[in-house]
């Protein structure tokens, strides 16, 4: 079997669909790492890596998963399909890519060549270039990920006829669907014949979900949360999907799981257009994840180009975002935008962050990756991937990979200690202690009670004099600017507070800003204006509904249309689509 299933005794996660439950065995991991050891140790220079590729032409390297996939080393100069390609326009950020070779598949006793070209970027990032679609696929973030999970994340693998199907049960339903998978009307009729049947929908490396086959969009009233939606909202959801696809489409089924109460809880909808291209509609939002993994309700993007690819890959393109292509092409195909792996430190190998001394020692890093105690039989992942702090603890305890000693500062009567190699320990120079402040700048002065009595008497006299001045009505004289001498009081504590009060400083509570209106005045709305606003909104919603209904009817009744014309509609019209349509899929209040 090309993948390992760990279904017996697997731990229970909070969301079991978000965790891989399979990876390569330790023997397979060592085989992949051993084959790519020369490439791993040459990553410091692009020229050295190209020389390595030229010196190892036609050498076959294992790719792990699937077990019969290999890399045949070839330089890029021998591939004519790469001469006119500008990969900088495809990838999210400028990155130098070095061609390593082509992917081949072992069938019986010979290798069958594919069109997939394997390239390597910075930090041993591995990309797959597919010339037929002019796309780049992120195969692995680094070589360690390739050795552990192989090509499992690469969608191009599931377009090859040699890849086995992940979805097989029930056999009669799957065989019947695959038989009519290239004819839209025949496939829709086949789904209608098996209405309500459950398919064990598998995604490689993930736990299976239930795909409930449904005849039409109106049949969703038997599934949660659509059973609580009124008929008008259900029709609005159907119109929104049509306005996104810009052509006639059909419903394949709902993907979800059965709850304890017996009802079917829907997470995704799988639909296909008149050209047998399959898409997913997000029903349940997932906002508690990082931005590359967030899924918003109402999002629609392509899952597969055929039913065979859908039953091989499952929901792989829902879980990962690793496809890079031109922006217009992505909008035409309704593809999900790939996340950028060049910004965060997560794109690099996490174990290189703990010790800068081995940052360029790739031979030592390779030994660290291939150590014998990295994998444990009772775990579904390597222990340093679950708890990265154990890397630092292991290095401190063992001390066999890096040794760090801080220079010891010398005391007043100590001399430099010469080591065995004749090198002297560096002398650490300390700063001189700060100069003590004057007595008048000391903030911790003990207050004098006699001075406080004098200050309070002076304060009372100032208040009486201020009242007399107010009664007389005479304006106080302002001093000239040139003769003003700043009075700086350096006393602290209670003396400073009393001095400010004696000087007649106003408190901060008296300072306020004139906002130009009365805050205590009650806000009064004109009910006539409010009713007029609601009436305008109601008319706008009614106009949007009628316009959408006319467009949907035109798409449903058109006899012939090419796929290129439909893709042109998506590029030109989907950008102007009202955001009110996507709100029809907002069922957050019905999910727990």
Curated annotation (Swiss-Prot):
InterPro entries: US22-like (IPR003360). Transmembrane segments: none annotated. The keyword Transmembrane helix does not apply. Residues 460-481 have a biased composition (Acidic residues). It is found in: Virion tegument. Keywords: Virion, Virion tegument. Residues 407-491 are annotated as: Disordered. GO terms for cellular component: viral tegument. The keyword Calcium does not apply. Belongs to the herpesviridae US22 family. This is Protein US23. The lineage of its organism: Viruses, Duplodnaviria, Heunggongvirae, Peploviricota, Herviviricetes. The gene is US23.
């Amino acid at each position: 079997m090309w993948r390992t299933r760990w279904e017996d005794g697997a731990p229970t996660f909070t969301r079991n669909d978000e965790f891989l439950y399979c990876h390569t065995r330790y023997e397979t991991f060592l085989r992949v790492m051993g084959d790519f050891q020369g490439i791993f140790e040459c990553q410091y220079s692009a020229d050295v890596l190209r020389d390595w590729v030229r010196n190892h032409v036609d050498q076959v390297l294992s790719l792990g998963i699937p077990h019969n996939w290999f890399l045949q080393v070839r330089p890029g100069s021998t591939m004519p399909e790469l001469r006119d390609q500008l990969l900088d326009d495809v990838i999210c950020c400028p990155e130098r890519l070095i061609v390593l070779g082509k992917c081949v598949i072992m069938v019986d006793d010979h290798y069958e060549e594919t069109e997939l070209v394997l390239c390597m970027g910075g930090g041993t990032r591995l990309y797959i270039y597919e010339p037929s679609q002019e796309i780049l696929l992120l195969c692995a973030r680094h070589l360690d990920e390739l050795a552990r999970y192989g090509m499992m994340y690469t969608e191009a693998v599931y377009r090859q006829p040699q890849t086995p199907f992940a979805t097989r049960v029930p056999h009669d339903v799957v065989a019947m669907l695959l038989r009519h998978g290239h004819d839209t009307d025949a496939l829709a009729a086949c789904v209608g014949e098996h209405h309500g049947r459950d398919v064990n929908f598998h995604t490689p490396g993930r736990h299976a979900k239930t795909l409930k086959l449904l005849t039409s969009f109106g049949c969703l009233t038997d599934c949660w949360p659509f059973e609580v939606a009124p008929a008008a909202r259900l029709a609005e959801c159907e119109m929104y999907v049509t306005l996104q696809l810009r052509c006639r489409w059909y419903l394949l089924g709902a993907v979800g799981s059965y709850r304890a109460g017996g009802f079917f809880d829907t997470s995704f909808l799988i639909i296909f257009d008149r050209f047998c291209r399959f898409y997913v509609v997000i029903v349940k939002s997932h906002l508690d994840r990082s931005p590359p993994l967030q899924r918003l309700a109402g999002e629609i993007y392509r899952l597969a180009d055929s039913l065979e690819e859908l039953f091989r890959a499952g929901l792989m393109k829902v879980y990962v975002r690793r496809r890079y292509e031109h922006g217009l092409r992505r909008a035409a195909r309704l593809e999900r935008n790939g996340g950028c792996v060049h910004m965060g430190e997560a794109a690099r190998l996490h174990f290189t962050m703990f010790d800068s001394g081995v940052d360029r020692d790739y031979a030592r890093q390779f030994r660290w990756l291939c150590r014998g105690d990295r994998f444990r039989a009772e775990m579904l992942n390597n222990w340093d991937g679950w708890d990265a702090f154990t890397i630092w603890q292991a290095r401190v305890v063992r001390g066999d990979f890096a040794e760090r000693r801080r220079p010891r500062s010398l005391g007043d009567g100590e001399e430099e200690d010469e080591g065995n190699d004749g090198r002297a320990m560096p002398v650490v120079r300390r700063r001189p202690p700060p100069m003590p402040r004057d007595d008048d700048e000391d903030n911790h002065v003990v207050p004098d009670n006699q001075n406080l009595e004098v200050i309070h008497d002076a304060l009372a006299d100032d208040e009486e004099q201020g009242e007399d001045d107010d009664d007389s009505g005479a304006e106080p004289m302002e001093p000239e600017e040139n003769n003003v001498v700043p009075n700086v009081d350096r006393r602290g504590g209670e003396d400073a507070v009393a001095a400010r009060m004696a000087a007649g400083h106003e408190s901060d509570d008296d300072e306020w800003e004139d906002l130009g209106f009365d805050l205590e005045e009650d806000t009064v709305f004109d009910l006539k204006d409010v009713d007029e606003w609601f009436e305008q909104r109601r008319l706008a919603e009614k106009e949007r509904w009628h316009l959408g209904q006319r467009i949907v009817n035109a798409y449903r009744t058109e006899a012939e249309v090419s796929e290129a014309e439909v893709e042109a509609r998506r590029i030109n019209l989907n950008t102007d689509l009202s955001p009110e349509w996507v709100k029809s899929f907002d069922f957050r209040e019905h999910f727990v």
